[in-house]
């Protein structure tokens, strides 16, 4: 009898392990990685919803001046209510994951992409330090000017031992956090953009916004970025469109 109970308990444990129930949602591997299958499922759901609703998209309402790559966030509640999606992807923020699902080119060819919310949290953390500094000082803690109106951070004034960075969702490289003249924080994607210019075929020229090279060719968008263009074969800040 004891042997039988032991086998039953062992079987239940195996079921729990295989189903992932022994692990918190935040620790399950599908929450931590971009998943092409999950992207495809959401893409199909978007298209089904669009067909059902005369071209309308299931997106959350944002202010008009919201940066382009953070503007068209997928509304999973709307997708589920329309029966276009049975469950929220486990790697989505709404499902306990690290990513926010967003759309690019929604007007003519809506495509599903990801924002890595760990970078969002990194920006928010530095902003807390920055706001504390600005409560006591007139000007933001400018470091070195790397382009007209774009600065590194005087990180020591913010209480950091080293320059704050984020981990790139594109390359895994550490990307610097930079600041404009108003004290707005951005991620500097020049490392990733240089890699993309070398890797992907393109016809971009000076004055074009080359961030789309990343958005078009990877599962991610370059969130929290200033616009960039190409100059002498290298990525450069596209300063005249800094509000995009």
List each language-model region with its residue ranges:
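N-terminal alpha-helical signal peptides/signal-anchor transmembrane segments
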Residues: 38-56
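Bacterial N-terminal signal peptides that target proteins for export
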Residues: 1-9
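Bacterial signal peptide processing site
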Residues: 22-25
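Extracellular/periplasmic head regions of type IV pilus-like filament subunits
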Residues: 59-120, 144-244
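Stable alpha-helical elements in mature extracytoplasmic
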Residues: 35-38, 72-75, 122, 126
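Pan-zinc metallopeptidase signature
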Residues: 121-141, 163
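Extracytoplasmic/periplasmic, Sec-exported soluble proteins
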Residues: 30, 34, 38, 64-71
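C-terminal motif of bacterial Sec signal peptides marking the signal peptidase cleavage site
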Residues: 16-20
């Amino acid at each position: 009898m004891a042997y039988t109970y032991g086998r039953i308990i062992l079987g239940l444990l195996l079921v729990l392990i295989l189903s992932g129930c022994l692990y918190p949602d935040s620790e399950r591997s599908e929450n931590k990685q971009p998943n092409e299958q999950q992207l495809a499922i959401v893409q199909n759901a978007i298209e089904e919803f669009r067909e059902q609703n005369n071209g309308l998209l299931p997106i959350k309402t944002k202010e008009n001046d919201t940066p382009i790559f953070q503007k068209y966030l997928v509304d999973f509640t709307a997708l589920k209510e329309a029966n276009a999606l049975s469950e929220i992807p486990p790697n989505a923020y709404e499902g306990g994951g690290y990513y926010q699902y967003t759309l690019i080119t929604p007007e003519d060819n809506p495509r599903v992409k990801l924002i890595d919310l760990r970078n969002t949290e990194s920006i928010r953390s530095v902003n807390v330090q920055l706001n504390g500094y600005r409560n006591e000082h007139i000007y933001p803690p400018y470091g070195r000017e790397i382009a007209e109106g774009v600065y590194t951070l005087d990180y020591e004034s913010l209480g950091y031992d080293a320059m704050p960075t984020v981990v790139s969702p594109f390359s895994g490289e550490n990307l610097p956090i930079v600041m404009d003249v108003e004290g707005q924080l951005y991620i500097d994607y020049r490392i990733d953009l240089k890699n993309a210019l070398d890797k992907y075929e393109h016809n971009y020229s000076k004055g074009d916004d080359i961030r789309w090279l990343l958005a078009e060719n990877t599962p991610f968008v370059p969130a929290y970025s200033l616009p960039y263009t190409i100059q002498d074969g290298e990525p450069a800040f596209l300063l005249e469109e800094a509000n995009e």
